[in-house]
Amino acid sequence: MAALDVTGGIATGKLGRDVGADEGQRGDRARMALLITGLALFFIVHLVPMRPSARAALIGGMGPGIYRGLFSLVSIAGLVLIVLGYGQMQGLGRGNPELWTPPVWIKHVVLLLMIPAMILLVAAYVPSRIRSAVGHPMLTALMIWAFAHLLANADLASLLLFGSFLVFAVVDRIAVIGRPSPGPLGSAKGGALQDMLAIAGGLGLYALILFWGHAKLTGVPLLP
């Protein structure tokens, strides 16, 4: 009888572990689905402007105000799901496996790559010669940012997140070849002062993120 009790206890324990494992796998899939849904929403709505005819048809059908409102709403919803899904997938172990092992020195490469990324990001809003030379500095900054973070993060969630942004930026950059740079600044050219403003602003933004912003936004400090 004692043997039966022991056997039954072992069977019950195994069943409990199996149920727990199944629930864990379902939770992992739900978190992954959250991230993928967010990425799909964000990029689908941002693919529409790549086809001017489709964008014009939507604006003509619903009006510019409703179009902008829906665009913003879907974009924000996608970003919220991306942040939630990516955040929940961190530290999941088997649910978010490491696909390779980044070398220790890659962190220094990433920190260097982010310097031009921040300068180009600021240059997108400054009518400088940098903006004119690059053409679409925002997309170029996005490409560098995504590529750099792919180098430093080897988990599945990071591959989905940063890989998706890299592919989107490359495709969008190809799609806008030959078009003037969008936005209120258009293709306006500036001089040395504007270049210096873009560089100084980019370096300032880089320092802010390096010493404070990244740790506050992601919980991961960049410096010891």
Regions found by a protein language model. Give the residues of each.
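Membrane-anchoring alpha-helices and their flanking helix-loop junctions
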Residues: 27-135, 140-224
